[in-house]
C-alpha cells in the first residue's frame, strides 16, 4: 500500500538512462525530480513520465545539496508529509524498501534517518564497479553518516536545518553530523534499498570522484572543528602526510643531494621505501580479504587516492583563501 505521508526527492544532472530507471522505481509514490542544468533530455524524460520537475537556475551554482533542498521545500508545502526519501538519479529503489523503512521509523521515533543496502548495478564489470560495491557495504546497525539515498524524518530535517546549499561535496555527512548533534539517531538496516549505477569506466572518472572526497574532508573539518562526533581531521591528516609531507621530504632531500651533499639522497630513498612498504602492507591485507585479483589493484587505488584527495583538499583551500565559490567536481559520463 502506498502511504500518503511519504514522498521522494530525486536529483540529477545528465543521468541519461540511469534517470529513467530511477524515476521508474518511484512510480506510484508522490515524487519530484530536481534537475541541475542537464544538457541531455533528462527534464523532458521526467515530464513524459508524469513526474513534477524543478529546474535549478545556474546563477547560484549547482550542487546536490541545493537540489535536495529544493525538492524538500516543494514537498513540505504539504503538512501531511512525515517522511522523505532522498534518491540520486543514478540509483533505483528496490521494491518494498519504503514499506520496510517507514515501518521502522514508525516504531522508533528517535530515528532521524534510515538507510539500507545499496548495491552496484554491475560490480564485476570493472575494478571501479567492484570498489563502488565495496564502498556501499555498510554493516547493519547504528551509523555515523549516510549517502545520497536515505529515508529522512521530516521533523529531523527541520530540526537540523536541511542540507547546506553551498557544499559541492560532503553535503550528506555534514547533514548527518548535524542530525546527530541535534540528538537524532541514524541507522543502517539489513534490507535492500537501491541499485546504484556508477557507470565508471575510466581512471579519470575515479580520480575526479576521489578529488571530491578530499575537498569534502577539508570542508567538513572547517565546518565542524573540534567535534567528537567525527574523525575527518584524521582523514585530512592522512592525506597531508602521505600526499603532502612525504613527497615534499623526497623532493627536498633530492635537491639537497644535488646541490650540497650527495648523501642526502638517502632521504628520498627512505621515502620511496616507506611508500613501497605501505603499499605491500595494504596489498597483503586486501588480498587476504578479497583475493589477489581484486585486493592488489585495490591497494594501489587506495595509495593513489591520497594524491587525488590532496588535489581536492588544495582546491578547497585555494577557493576559501580567494573567497571564491567552488564549482562542481564532475566525474560522470553523460
Predicted regions and their residues:
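Short, well-formed alpha-helical segments that are part of the catalytic scaffolds
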Residues: 10-28
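A conserved acidic beta->alpha catalytic loop
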Residues: 35-44, 58, 91
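Glycine-rich, basic loop-to-helix element that forms the pyrophosphate-binding segment
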Residues: 58-77
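Short beta-strand-to-loop acidic/aromatic patch adjacent to the donor-nucleotide binding site
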Residues: 79-92
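Conserved donor NDP-sugar-binding/catalytic core segment of glycosyltransferases
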Residues: 92-126, 197
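A recurrent flexible, glycine/aromatic-enriched loop bordering the glycosyltransferase active site
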Residues: 120-121, 135-152, 159, 167-168, ...
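Catalytic donor/gating beta->alpha subdomain of glycosyltransferases that bind UDP-sugars
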Residues: 166-167, 173-231
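Membrane-embedded multi-pass helical conduit in multi-pass membrane proteins
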Residues: 243-318
Amino acid at each position: 500500500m502506498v502511504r500518503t505521508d511519504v514522498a521522494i526527492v530525486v536529483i540529477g544532472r545528465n543521468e541519461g538512462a540511469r534517470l529513467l530507471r530511477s524515476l521508474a522505481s518511484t512510480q506510484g509514490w508522490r515524487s519530484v525530480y530536481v534537475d541541475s542544468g542537464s544538457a541531455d533530455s533528462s527534464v523532458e524524460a521526467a515530464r513524459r513520465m508524469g513526474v513534477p520537475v524543478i529546474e535549478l537556475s545556474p546563477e547560484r551554482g549547482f550542487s546536490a545539496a541545493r537540489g535536495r533542498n529544493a525538492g524538500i521545500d516543494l514537498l513540505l508545502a504539504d503538512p501531511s508529509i512525515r517522511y522523505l526519501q532522498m534518491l540520486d538519479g543514478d540509483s533505483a529503489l528496490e521494491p518494498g524498501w519504503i514499506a520496510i523503512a517507514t515501518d521502522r521509523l514508525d516504531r522508533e521515533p528517535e530515528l532521524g534517518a534510515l538507510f539500507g543496502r545499496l548495491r552496484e548495478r554491475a560490480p564485476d564489470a570493472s575494478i571501479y564497479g567492484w570498489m563502488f560495491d565495496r564502498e556501499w557495504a555498510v554493516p547493519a546497525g547504528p551509523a555515523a553518516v549516510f549517502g545520497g539515498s536515505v529515508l529522512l524524518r521530516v521533523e529531523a530535517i527541520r530540526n537540523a536545518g536541511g542540507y547546506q546549499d553551498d557544499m559541492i561535496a560532503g553535503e550528506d555527512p555534514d547533514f548527518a553530523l548535524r542530525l546527530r548533534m541535534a540528538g537524532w539517531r541514524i541507522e543502517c538496516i539489513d534490507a535492500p534499498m537501491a541499485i546504484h549505477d556508477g557507470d565508471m569506466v575510466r581512471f579519470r572518472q575515479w580520480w575526479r570522484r576521489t578529488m571530491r572526497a578530499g575537498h569534502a574532508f577539508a570542508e567538513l573539518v572547517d565546518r565542524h572543528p573540534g567535534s567528537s562526533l567525527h574523525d575527518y581531521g584524521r582523514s585530512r591528516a592522512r592525506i597531508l602526510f602521505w600526499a603532502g609531507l612525504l613527497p615534499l621530504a623526497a623532493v627536498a632531500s633530492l635537491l639537497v643531494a644535488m646541490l650540497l651533499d650527495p648523501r642526502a639522497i638517502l632521504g628520498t630513498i627512505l621515502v620511496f621505501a616507506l611508500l613501497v612498504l605501505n603499499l605491500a602492507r595494504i596489498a597483503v591485507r586486501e588480498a587476504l580479504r578479497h583475493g589477489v585479483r581484486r585486493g592488489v589493484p585495490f591497494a594501489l587505488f587506495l595509495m593513489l587516492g591520497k594524491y587525488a584527495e590532496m588535489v581536492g583538499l588544495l582546491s578547497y583551500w585555494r577557493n576559501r583563501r580567494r573567497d571564491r565559490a567552488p564549482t562542481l567536481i564532475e566525474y560522470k559520463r553523460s
